Each structure stands twice: as structure tokens, then as C-alpha cells.
Amino acid sequence: MPQFAAQIGSRDGFSDELLHYVDSDGVEYFTVKATGQSGMSPSGLAKLLGVEQAQISRWVNRVQQADPLNNSLPKCLKSFAGHDPNFSAYFDIEKRNILSDSFCVAIIKYYASYSNRANKESQAKAQQTLYSITQIGMRVFIHEKTRWMEA
């Protein structure tokens, strides 16, 4: 039943199952209320990196069509080969997909480290974003290990 519920829009046009945030640059973030599963819209990820949304869409298609065992994907994207990086049951009322947080990180890593085609500004944005994610990720990792919770 969560798939059906996730497809019903609320008054703001997004599923009642999702938390939705848009930052000042128009980057969209989503979290599934019940599970904490997080992700971004393809257009939001593109804005975050300073690239065209078509570039993100090409990577989505490329990983979906890639053979899981034999492909030429960059190392950071290989684990997604043959899989759909979108949330399978959650999308907004316009039926736009939401990319999983792990795929978003892989794309950010690609633009920060592997892409020869990214312009210097996009690469710098990706590197700064990756650094921020790493810092936050390490903090959350340690919090989980020490069982720290905000009071």
C-alpha cells in the first residue's frame, strides 16, 4: 500500500509520505517520512553541480542500461550498473523521479574526481559538495557508533 499512498498528492503537490525542501538555489531534497530514505530531484542535483539536467538524465539512463558485470562506467558508478537509481515507490504529483542519496553522492564524486568534461566551476562545486558530505557523513557515522542523539 505505500506505493499507492505515495502517489497521492498533498495540497503542496508532493506526497504526504515525503518531506520536501527547496534551497535558495532551487535544489530539491526529499526524505521518506517512514524510513528516512533520502534523495534529490534530477534537476536539483544538476543545479547543485552547475550542470545541465540532461547530463544527469544521461547518467541515469547509462547506469540503468549497463551490464552489472561488464561495463565501462566510472568506478564510482559501477555499483549502480543495471539498477534504477530512482526511488521505486515515491515521486511527486507530477510523477518526477527522485534519485537516491547514494546515487547522488556517486554522481557528485564523478564530477568532483573523474569527469574530464566538467567545466572548472562545476568541478569545484562538486569537490566542495563532496567535502561537505564527507564531513557530515563522518559525524553521523561517529554519532551512530557512540549512540549519540540530539537532546
What is each PLM-predicted segment?
Residues 1-55, 61-151:
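Positively charged, aromatic-accented nucleic-acid-binding surfaces
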